Amino acid sequence: MSQTVNIVGAGLAGSEAAYQLAQRGIKVNLIEMRPVKQTPAHHTDKFAELVCSNSLRGNALTNGVGVLKEEMRRLDSLIISAADKARVPAGGALAVDRHDFSGYITETLRNHPNVTVINEEINSIPEGYTIIATGPLTTENLAKEIVDITGKDQLYFYDAAAPIIEKESIDMDKVYLKSRYDKGEAAYLNCPMTEEEFNRFYDAVLEAEVAPTNEFEKEKYFEGCMPFEVMAERGRKTLLFGPMKPVGLEDPKTGKRPFAVVQLRQDDAAGTLYNIVGFQTHLKWGAQKEVIRLIPGLENVDIVRYGVMHRNTFINSPDVLNEKYELIKEDRIQFAGQMTGVEGYVESAASGLVAGINLAHKLLDKGEVIFPRETMIGSMAYYISHAKNEKNFQPMNANFGLLPSLEKRIKDKKERYEAQANRALEYLENYKKTL
C-alpha cells in the first residue's frame, strides 16, 4: 500500500485512528505539535493525554458509555486496551493512571512499523487523505482553514478541569471510603458536610474571584463539564443535586446521610493523588485554595494542580459530515474527536476508530463501514451527521436515548438498558463478520 495517510493531532481520536489504519497495513504520518508548541491545557508530550478527569466513566452495560467501551474492546481499540491496562480503583467506573495510560499509547504508536511521528505545528490542511483530530484547542491558523473548508462559523464553549490534591494532606479522620449505593469496590473518599458547613462553602463559592476571559469569547458551557461556581450561580440546590449530592453515601460511622458530600477520586495508580469529583473550575488559584479548604477533611490540603479552563472548538457536523466522519464536499478529509460534536474521552476515541477503519477500507477497496444504529458506536456517528437542530448543535455523550427503541417496550429502566445493551452487542458481532 503506497498511499500514506496524514493524521493531525495525537489525542484520543487521532491516536485511535492511527492505530486502526496502521493495524490494517496503511502507512500513517501522525502529526502532533507538542512538545514543539504546547496548549494551555496539556502538561506533557505524550499522546492521548487526559487533560480533564482521569475517569473514562461507567463500565457497566447499564450505562451508555459502558456499552460503547465494550463495543470498542471487541473492535480492538487501542484506547480501551490502554485504559484496561492502566486501571485504578474507581467503583463502577473505569478510571486510569493518566501517565501509564498515555505512556502505553505513545509507546505503542511510536514503535509501530506503519506509523511515522512528526512533531510540528500544522497551519493548513495537508494534501492527500487526512484525518483532522486536533481537538478542542485547535490552533488559530488551522481553525481558520477549517472554517473556510466547512463553510461554517466556528462554534466554541469552555471546558474545565478539576483540581488534584495530595492524599497525605487529607484529614482521614473526617472522610470515609465508599462508592455511591455501595456499587463496585469502595473507591471514593467522601467529605461529608452539615447544612451549616455547606452554606458556608456555598456562600464562599459565590463570592470567590473568577479568572478573567477575553471579552470577545462568549461563555457557552457543555452541561457535562460545567464549572462548579457556574452551577452554584444557578441556585443553592444545584450543587446538592449535582456533584455534592449525598444520596447513597450514608456515613458508615453514623449510618446517616450527610447534608452534602464532596467526593474525591483516585487519580494515579499509586493512590497518592486524588481529584475532586465534579469540581472543574474557573476560579483564580488563590480563591480555589480558600474554597477547597472549607471542605471537611481538606482544611490543610496540598493542591498539586489547580483547576483550569480552556476553550473547546467544534464544527457544525450535521451540515458538513457523514456517518464515516468524512467531509461531505471533500471526502479525502475526515474529522475525528471532540471537534465533531462527540463529547467525552471514550466518544472521541470511538469517532477516531470509525474514521480510521473507514479510511482503511476505502484505501483497500473494501467498501464503506456504517455501523448499525442499534450499536452505540453507530448511534454516535448517526447523531453527529443527522442531528437536525443545526442552529444549536450540541456535543453529545454516549447514552441510550440515541439508540432506536426496542420492538417491545420495557417499563423498568434498568431492564430496558440491559436489553438495549444486549441488542447493541449482538448487532456489533453480526456486523463484525462483514468487516
From Swiss-Prot:
It is found in: Cytoplasm. Gene3D superfamilies: FAD/NAD(P)-binding domain. It holds the Pfam family GIDA. It comes from the Bacteria. It catalyses: uridine(54) in tRNA + (6R)-5,10-methylene-5,6,7,8-tetrahydrofolate + NADH + H(+) = 5-methyluridine(54) in tRNA + (6S)-5,6,7,8-tetrahydrofolate + NAD(+); uridine(54) in tRNA + (6R)-5,10-methylene-5,6,7,8-tetrahydrofolate + NADPH + H(+) = 5-methyluridine(54) in tRNA + (6S)-5,6,7,8-tetrahydrofolate + NADP(+). Its EC number is 2.1.1.74. The keyword NADP applies. GO terms for cellular component: cytosol. Its cofactor is FAD. FAD binds at residues 9-14. The keyword Cytoplasm applies. GO terms for molecular function: flavin adenine dinucleotide binding; tRNA (uracil(54)-C5)-methyltransferase activity, 5,10-methylenetetrahydrofolate-dependent. GO terms for biological process: tRNA methylation; tRNA wobble uridine modification. Its main location: cytoplasm. Keywords: Cytoplasm, FAD, Flavoprotein, Methyltransferase, NAD, NADP, Transferase, tRNA processing. Belongs to the MnmG family. TrmFO subfamily. HAMAP family: TrmFO. Catalyzes the folate-dependent formation of 5-methyl-uridine at position 54 (M-5-U54) in all tRNAs. This is Methylenetetrahydrofolate--tRNA-(uracil-5-)-methyltransferase TrmFO. It comes from Staphylococcus haemolyticus (strain JCSC1435). The gene is trmFO.
